[in-house]
Amino acid sequence: MTLSVLSRKDKERVIRRLLLQAPPGEFVNAFDDLCLLIRDEKLMHHQGECAGHQHCQKYSVPLCIDGNPVLLSHHNVMGDYRFFDHQSKLSFRYDLLQNQLKDIQSHGIIRNETEYLRVVVLCALKLYVNDHYPKGNCNVLRKTVKSKEYLIACIEDHNYETGECWNGLWKSKWIFQVNPFLTQVTGRIFVQAHFFRCVNLHIEISKDLKESLEIVNQAQLALSFARLVEEQENKFQAAVLEELQELSNEALRKILRRDLPVTRTLIDWQRILSDLNLVMYPKLGYVIYSRSVLCNWII
């Protein structure tokens, strides 16, 4: 069934689903390709706005407001496609297709002990991110749920090399409740890489974590939290390297092998696998596959 015979409602559903599948850094490319197929500017613009809003939340798209980094997520969504930034005290809409802030408005915040703690935690987290990530961004948000105060720390770094046919994203999120003596930190680390020269190869790895932190004062909590994040992300990075190395040595040999016609020619799979190297950015944690011989076989 072609798109031309679908109802408008079905077209909207298909377009949005395809756009939401776009890997980080490739949303605009996916949108432009779909525009060539759909040829309905009004329909594409509306669906692009809706899907772009969700894409920003899913992949923590970074912005810069008044010289400060802002990470978009569902934690700072206000509704009506608007986001809120604690640091600049502004609310705004973001057009991902045009990479443009729109309808910027001031938005006040309550200055209490939790807000002061948020600022202290952000300072400690920035020191860690600046030391470990080449182009990293971080943000700390406040949220109140059923009269309980929470801090949400987000970290993001990416390298989108479309010209080299690969993109990579590392992000993590850490949430803890503001308690007097002890709090539990819930975290999630996520890595995604996409290589698309001759072969379409996706890697997605994530891990959920739970750790406890003692609270003495604001400065101690901020430093302990930053050390916890550093320790857990270092462990995750080491585990990713180990697991992917094992995968490249064993599992990928079976996954990537395909039935070929009988040519009476011996295919040296070991030589192919030896060219399937893992590339690691030590401070960032991106993992991608190098190509060369592999790409000559998978077409």
Swiss-Prot record:
GO terms for cellular component: cortical cytoskeleton; F-actin capping protein complex; membrane; sperm head. InterPro entries: CapZ_alpha (IPR002189), CapZ_alpha/beta (IPR037282), CapZ_alpha/beta_2 (IPR042276), CapZ_alpha_1 (IPR042489), F-actin_cap_asu_CS (IPR017865). Keywords: Actin capping, Actin-binding, Phosphoprotein. Belongs to the F-actin-capping protein alpha subunit family. Component of the F-actin capping complex, composed of a heterodimer of an alpha and a beta subunit. Component of the WASH complex, composed of F-actin-capping protein subunit alpha (CAPZA1, CAPZA2 or CAPZA3), F-actin-capping protein subunit beta (CAPZB), WASHC1, WASHC2, WASHC3, WASHC4 and WASHC5. The modification Phosphoserine is found at residue 290. GO terms for biological process: actin filament organization; barbed-end actin filament capping; cytoplasm organization; spermatid development. GO terms for molecular function: actin filament binding. The keyword Phosphoprotein applies. This is F-actin-capping protein subunit alpha-3. The gene is CAPZA3. F-actin-capping proteins bind in a Ca(2+)-independent manner to the fast growing ends of actin filaments (barbed end) thereby blocking the exchange of subunits at these ends. Unlike other capping proteins (such as gelsolin and severin), these proteins do not sever actin filaments. May play a role in the morphogenesis of spermatid.
